Structure formats: C-alpha cells, structure tokens
C-alpha cells in the first residue's frame, strides 16, 4: 500500500510539473505575440504610402536599411526592392538625402558601397547619398542615424514585415520617423 501511495504521489508530481511547463510555454508564446501586437499597434499610423511620404515636410533623409548581397556583390532581391523604394522617394523629393546603412564589417563584404552604386546608377548625385558602414542591425542603423548623422526626422524603407520594428526603435530613440514598405513583389 505504501508503495502504491508513493507511486501515486510521483505521478501527481509529474502531472503538476508537466502542467506547469505547458502553462509556462503558453505564457511565453502569449508574451511574444503580445509584444509584437503592441509594437505594431504603436506605430501603425506611421506607415505611409510613397505618395503620403512625399507630402511630409522637413524630412532629413530617407534611411534604406541593408539586408544582404548576392555572391557577385550586387544587391539581394530584398535589398534591390528597398533601394528602388528609397530612390523613388528621393526622386519624389520626400527628402534631400538618402542614407544607406548596412554591413561593411569585412573588406570582402560591402553592402553600403553596393547600395550607393545602385542609387547613383538611378541618377542620384553622389553627394546626396550618405553611407553608414556600421549598420549591422536595425537598432544600430537607427541609432547611428540619430547620433552620427544627426537625423531628427526621417522616412525608413524596409519590407513591411520589418517596418513596425524599425519604426518602434526610432520612436524609442526619440526620432520622428515614418516608414514606407518596399514590397513590390507582393
């Protein structure tokens, strides 16, 4: 009988432990979705169309976030889309400057010069394209836009899935920012 009672206690303990783990897992998943929903809701009014962005006033620059190169050093398809959108905003006079921010941490990998080359090939004067060679993450790109390039008001260009996070970071860093998604393929 004692053995049976110990076995029942052990089973009860295992069930409680499993229930606690499932509850903890569900809370973690809920927290992730909750934070994501909060971030998206807090900046939703800052996501604009190209036309709306062109109507903004006193914008310092259009910030194009880097996102990878092909093996030959040309922009990846996603980066190409971002650059096209950034160039279009510049051409519509949404801002007087284009700030390209990306990874140039190794000599053989240089997102920012590839980005600048693309912009120049589209007719943007070299002196209107600023390069941030240390934009290794979204946070670093936005932080450096504020602290290195003295940006106070900007339009951020990235894919829609990434735009809310970039705008939220800008908001938390005290930058007045709007965003335009670069998703011509969807």
Q: Which positions does each model-derived feature cover?
A:
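N-terminal type II signal-anchor transmembrane helix
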Residues: 4-51
């Amino acid at each position: 009988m004692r053995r049976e009672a110990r076995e029942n206690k052990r089973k009860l303990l295992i069930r409680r432990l499993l229930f606690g783990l499932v509850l903890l897992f569900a809370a973690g998943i809920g927290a992730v979705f909750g934070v994501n929903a909060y971030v998206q809701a807090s900046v939703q009014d800052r996501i604009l169309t190209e036309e709306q962005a062109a109507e903004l006033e006193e914008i310092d620059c259009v910030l194009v976030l880097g996102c990878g190169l092909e093996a030959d050093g040309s922009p990846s398809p996603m980066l190409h889309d971002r650059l096209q959108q950034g160039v279009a905003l510049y051409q519509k006079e949404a801002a007087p400057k284009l700030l390209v921010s990306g990874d140039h941490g190794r000599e053989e990998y240089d997102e920012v010069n590839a980005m600048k080359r693309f912009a120049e090939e589209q007719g943007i004067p070299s002196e209107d394209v600023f390069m941030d060679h240390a934009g290794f993450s979204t946070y670093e790109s936005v932080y450096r836009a504020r602290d290195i390039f003295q940006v106070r008001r900007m339009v951020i260009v990235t894919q829609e899935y990434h735009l809310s996070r970039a705008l939220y970071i800008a908001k938390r860093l005290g930058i007045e920012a709007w965003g335009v998604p670069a998703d011509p393929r969807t």
